[in-house]
Amino acid sequence: GSEMCIRDRSTDTNFIIVLLDAVDEECFWQVWEQHPEYKEEMRDFTFYNNTMSGYAYTDHSLPLIISGEWYENKEPFLDYQIRIFKNSPFFEYLKKQDYTLSYYEDEYKFEVGVMDGAFNNLAYTQSSLWDAPLFNKRIIKMVGMKYAPYLLKPKCWFNVDMLNNQEMTPKDEELFSWKNKAFYDDLKEDEISYVDGKRFKLIHLMGAHVPFYYDKDVNVIDNANYYTCIESSMTVTMAYLDKLREAGVYDNSVIIVLSDHGYNIEGDAIDTPQRNENETGRQHPILFIKGLNENHDFQVSGAPISFEDLVGAYYKLLDGVASDDCFEYKEGDQRERRYLLYKYLGEDHMVEYMQTGYAGDESTLIPTGRVFDAK
């Protein structure tokens, strides 16, 4: 797991990625248009509204975001994942430039020793439970997700990864929780302090992932839906940016705010998790970028961007290139963008598509006939 400590920021250059899980561009923009205050808060950023993710789920999206390297079932996924997190060329470059790398999330667990030297905030956890009754309740829910009558299934839904968060760390340090509320509460309580040296932070938050908990003010409510969770994600993001501004480290930070993939929401915002995914609908994430010392009104670009382009843009941003100039593609350019699709938990069989048009247009997302199956 990774320890909580989102507070140190350096007076040198920082590189900060805030990943809001499962925020879909189309739904996001509906929320954006209801909130004129967002535009002022996201000044200095360029919003890329025609961005394609590479995959429909977090596990494969995140390594692509930080490495630009596609996973095609040619090796065990864990081998690929460890290689990317430990030795991706971008991370190697940052280390050579004396960046301290930290990664905040609570989903990934690695064997002891595997990730040594990768991030400075990893904690070893013992698998002892701090709340056995809660654990038992969650196990019963998990069984219910599979065997309960259909009507009861929504009541049984919870994020199975929360089982992991019941582990104790050796010194009882609190592990980072990806829940929007936990991060938001920490932001309100803690000051960001100056430290020497260059910092890279990758912060993975729940965003608008199921189950839906939050209203726009990040209160846990019973009738939360996908849209209120997008609002809560923005509330948390804006509070974080304000903290960086207050601490005087906003200008000298490259800041990326993105989602790892979109979401295929049908009709009204539904509050039960989708388990029978459509073929498509998750390929259109959000992407905000701010370069070093940018100072301008919020701007939108329709350039046809793919997540495989991100790492190339990171290097340019660190060199001082502005956010509207960090990709080689410009608005109006035509290109085909790759998308590897698999069904939920069916990553052994990936089907290649090409997006021949606008990222959000499913009618132009065409299968190429290529598939990538696990050996």
Feature locations, PLM:
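Catalytic domains that recognize anionic headgroups
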Residues: G1-K375
